[in-house]
């Protein structure tokens, strides 16, 4: 399979390791996560960003994309939530603007920088969508990160619907079938904590965004909850 950014694989570019050790990126992520904690949101820490980066990379690797594109997905995945340091509203666009300036510090081609910035800017379901394979993999990595450990430590009596939905997920697996071109998210949800209705009230738009992202990759997105096919 040809690289998404054809002809630039030979250039010496920055790496995922470089961006993970970038002080400005990490301070933006820490500040954004602290802000969201005070506003009552679930965890958006570096652990979430690493998970998104690795999932995005795994998806592209399974579908045969070159290492160059996989590395771009890792970088975009790690940086995708830096805009939360400015404001949660339109954080994707803020993140893209911040990333553009940070990436100018590196020996990175203009097409690669724009690809990363575009993926970050389009990852939020309220304003964006998949525009290329890098952004598609990032979206799926981000929107499928539903797990109990993303709920911050607080009394259960104070949980809002977002807390309950994440806390109710007792098991989550994302499977990639490259041969059949299928991306499957399988969830186990404790319905004593959160009803199926509540889950889909919060996550339906995100799951539909995953379906669009899978389509960009020439694949089908399937969602199973408690053994029942949903999408």
Which residues are covered by each model-predicted region?
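Divalent metal-dependent catalytic cores for phosphoryl transfer on phosphate-bearing substrates
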Residues: 37-38, 48, 61-176
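Acidic/His-rich, divalent-metal-binding segments that scaffold phosphate/diphosphate chemistry
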Residues: 2-91
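Aromatic/hydrophobic pocket-lining residues that form π-stacking "cages" and hydrophobic walls in ligand
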Residues: 56, 137, 210
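Generic alpha-helical secondary structure signal
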Residues: 23-30, 111-114, 132, 201-204, ...
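Terminal helices and disordered tails flanking the catalytic cores of nucleotide-processing hydrolases
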Residues: 3-6, 10, 145-231
């Amino acid at each position: 399979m040809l690289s998404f950014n054809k002809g630039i694989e030979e250039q010496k570019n920055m790496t995922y390791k470089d961006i993970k050790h970038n002080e400005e990126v990490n301070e933006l992520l820490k500040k954004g996560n602290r802000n969201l904690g005070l506003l009552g949101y679930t965890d958006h820490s570096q652990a979430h960003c690493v998970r998104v980066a690795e999932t995005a990379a795994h998806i592209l690797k399974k579908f045969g994309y070159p290492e160059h594109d996989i590395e771009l997905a890792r970088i975009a995945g790690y940086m995708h939530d830096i805009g939360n340091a400015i404001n949660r509203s339109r954080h994707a666009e803020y993140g893209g603007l911040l990333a553009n300036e940070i990436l100018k510090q590196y020996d990175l081609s203009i097409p690669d920088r724009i690809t990363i910035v575009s993926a970050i800017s389009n990852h939020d379901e309220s304003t964006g969508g998949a525009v290329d394979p890098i952004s598609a993999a990032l979206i799926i990595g981000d929107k499928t990160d539903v797990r109990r450990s993303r709920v911050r430590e607080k009394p259960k009596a104070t949980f809002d619907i977002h807390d309950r939905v994440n806390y109710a997920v007792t098991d989550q697996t994302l499977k990639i079938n490259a041969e059949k071109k299928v991306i499957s998210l399988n969830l186990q949800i404790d319905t004593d904590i959160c009803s199926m209705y509540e889950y889909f009230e919060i996550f339906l738009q995100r799951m539909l965004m995953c379906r669009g992202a899978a389509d960009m990759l020439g694949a089908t997105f399937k969602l199973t909850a408690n053994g029942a096919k949903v999408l």
